[in-house]
Each structure stands twice: as structure tokens, then as C-alpha cells.
């Protein structure tokens, strides 16, 4: 039912971490800022290495570079305002700024989903059809696949942002989160949001279930091909090229599915925040981990090993923070 005699909202306030004590907020600020800087530097290192080393000018590393760029933009869309909110918890955000944040969050988040799917297809072609790999995964095809992923992200984001901010927001202006998210914004609308929730669910299915299904099919075919390899060493190398990508896929789609595909009745504010904190800080560190071993068994360069060490540090920090967050919530 629409709410009558209400004033339309022009700005929102994030509830974020307002329930925590000030000393806890300062600890979170230091941890988040450190992880944020490590994330940015780690992605820049990866992009620089791929750009400078001509041996890495392959489809696999092209998509890795695109994923690093996308993850960097995704992180920049969320974390800076969250850090500001930890120091100034009562800082409002204008509806236009909230819409902008949601747009970039959705664009690059959805782009990440489809880039991971494309990377799975790349591994499928490399292992199941190696003789035609260079023909199928040519420069033009790689650019088209990367552009298609971004195009889908832009299209889905426009649909979602237009759907959400076409609603009236009256009286209620406190978002029970630390960034502008579709599910939490819909709760503040002073009108029926059934259609919007259906749109959100359909988009979530298209962005999560469909890519997950494609990745699953790719890996079924990949595993069946690997098992046919006579050499145990050959099987090991083939599995190694896919293991890190598969790990990232499970974490990425797993966290996103828990947040966006579960029924509204099972939505838990504390659980959503915990998963979102882990997701937004953990996922951006992962592109650097999707570095399959060279099929020829060559060792990574010193720069690549350094980048991986930085990522390991980031992942340990994220895991430690998540544990602390659970205990303090």
C-alpha cells in the first residue's frame, strides 16, 4: 500500500557499521583501507606485467587483464564511500549519487560474472580443442567476448537502476547496508515493489544461474577430456590450468547466489552484511589468483610471483577480518 502524506526522499543514509563502537570502526577502517590499497596495487601489478611481457599476450591473460580492470572499477565504486562512512557514519548520499554507485556496482559486478564464464570457455577450447585454439580464440573473438560481457553488464545495470529509482521513496531513508544495493533500496520504496522484485530475480537468474550453468557444462567437458589423457603428468598440468579459475568461480557465484537468489523470507540483515563485506573485499583480490601454470611447465616470472605473494597476503587479511566480523556482530 502506498504511504500517504509523506515527503519524498532526496538523500539516503547508510546504517553500515553504526552499531559498532568507535574503536571497532577505526580498526575496520585500517583493515579495509589496507585491503583496498593492496587490491588496487595488486591489480595494477597484474595489468602492468601482462602489458609489458609479450609472452603473456594470449587470450587467457587478456581476459585476466580485463577482469582485473573490471574488479578495480567494481571496488572503487563501493569501498571509498564505505571508508568515509566508517569515519563519518552520519554522512548522507544523494539519490543521484546512490543511483550512480548502484549503476557501476551492477555494471562491473555483472561484467565479472560473464568474464569468468568467458574464461571458462577459453579453458574449454584450450583443453578440448587445442589444435584450433589459436583460430577460435583469435584477437577479434577475444575483443568481442570481452565487449559482450561489458555490454550485458551495462544493459542489465540500466534496467535495474531505472526500475529501482523509478519508484517513490518516502520518509524511510536509512539503507540497512554499507552501499546502495537493489534489495535494500526496494525495502524503502513507499509503493508496491512486486514487479521490481520480479525484475531483480529475473536479472539475478540471468546473471548467475545461466553463467554458472555454462561454466558447469564447460568443466564437465574439460574433465571428461582430461581423464582421457594417458599421462598422469599431462592430467596434472591440465587440471592445474583450471583449478584456480574454478576456485574463483565457486567463491564468486557462491557468495552472489546466497545474497541475490535466496527467498526474501530467508533474508538476514547480519548475514547479508557479512557476505557482502567478504565478497566486496575478497573477490577483487582473486583475478591475480587466476594465473594458471604455463602448459609447458615454465616457472612464473619474479614479478608474477611477487604479485601472487601480495594476493596471498590480501586473502589472509580478508579471512582474518571475516572471522573477526563474525565474532563482533
Curated annotation (Swiss-Prot):
User: Its GO CC terms?
Assistant: membrane; plasma membrane
| Disulfide cysteine pairs (residue numbers) | 98-190
Q: Which residues cross the membrane?
A: 27-47, 56-76, 101-121, 141-161, 199-218, 239-259, 273-293
Q: What InterPro entries does its record include? A: GPCR_Rhodpsn (IPR000276), GPCR_Rhodpsn_7TM (IPR017452), Olfact_rcpt (IPR000725)
The topology of this chain with respect to the membrane is: Multi-pass membrane protein
Question: Where in the sequence is the signal peptide annotated?
Answer: none
Gene3D superfamilies for this protein: Rhodopsin 7-helix transmembrane proteins
User: Pfam families attached here?
Assistant: 7tm_4
Q: Which residues lie on this side of the membrane: Extracellular?
A: 1-26, 77-100, 162-198, 260-272
Q: Which residues are glycosylated?
A: 5
PANTHER family xref list: OLFACTORY RECEPTOR
Name of the protein? Olfactory receptor 10J3
Organism of origin: Homo sapiens (Human)
Name the gene that codes for it.
OR10J3
Amino acid at each position: 500500500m502506498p504511504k500517504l502524506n509523506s515527503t519524498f526522499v532526496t538523500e539516503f543514509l547508510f546504517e553500515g557499521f553504526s552499531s559498532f563502537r568507535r574503536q571497532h570502526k577505526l580498526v575496520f577502517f585500517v583493515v579495509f583501507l589496507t585491503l583496498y590499497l593492496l587490491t588496487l596495487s595488486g591489480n595494477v601489478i597484474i595489468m602492468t606485467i601482462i602489458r609489458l611481457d609479450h609472452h603473456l599476450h594470449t587470450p587467457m591473460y587478456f581476459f585476466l587483464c580485463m577482469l582485473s580492470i573490471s574488479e578495480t572499477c567494481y571496488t572503487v565504486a563501493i569501498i571509498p564511500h564505505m571508508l568515509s562512512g566508517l569515519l563519518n557514519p552520519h554522512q548522507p548520499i544523494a539519490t543521484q549519487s546512490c543511483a550512480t554507485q548502484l549503476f557501476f556496482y551492477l555494471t562491473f559486478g555483472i561484467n565479472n560474472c560473464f568474464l569468468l564464464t568467458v574464461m571458462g570457455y577459453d579453458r574449454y577450447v584450450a583443453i578440448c580443442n587445442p589444435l584450433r585454439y589459436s583460430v577460435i580464440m583469435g584477437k577479434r573473438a577475444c575483443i568481442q567476448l570481452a565487449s559482450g560481457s561489458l555490454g550485458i553488464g551495462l544493459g542489465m545495470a540500466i534496467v535495474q537502476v531505472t526500475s529501482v529509482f523509478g519508484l517513490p521513496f518516502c520518509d524511510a531513508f536509512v539503507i540497512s547496508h554499507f552501499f546502495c544495493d537493489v534489495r535494500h533500496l526496494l525495502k524503502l520504496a513507499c509503493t508496491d515493489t512486486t514487479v521490481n522484485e520480479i525484475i531483480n530475480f529475473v536479472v539475478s537468474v540471468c546473471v548467475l544461474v545461466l553463467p554458472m550453468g555454462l561454466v558447469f557444462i564447460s568443466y564437465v567437458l574439460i574433465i571428461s577430456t582430461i581423464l582421457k589423457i594417458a599421462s598422469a603428468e599431462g592430467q596434472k598440468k591440465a587440471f592445474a590450468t583450471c583449478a584456480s579459475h574454478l576456485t574463483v568461480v565457486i567463491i564468486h557465484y557462491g557468495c552472489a547466489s546466497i545474497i541475490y537468489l535466496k527467498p526474501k523470507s530467508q533474508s538476514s540483515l547480519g548475514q547479508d552484511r557479512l557476505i557482502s563485506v567478504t565478497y566486496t573485499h575478497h573477490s577483487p583480490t582473486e583475478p591475480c589468483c587466476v594465473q594458471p601454470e604455463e602448459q609447458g611447465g615454465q616457472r612464473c616470472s619474479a614479478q608474477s610471483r611477487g604479485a601472487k605473494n601480495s594476493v596471498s597476503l590480501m586473502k589472509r587479511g580478508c579471512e582474518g577480518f571475516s572471522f573477526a566480523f563474525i565474532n563482533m556482530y
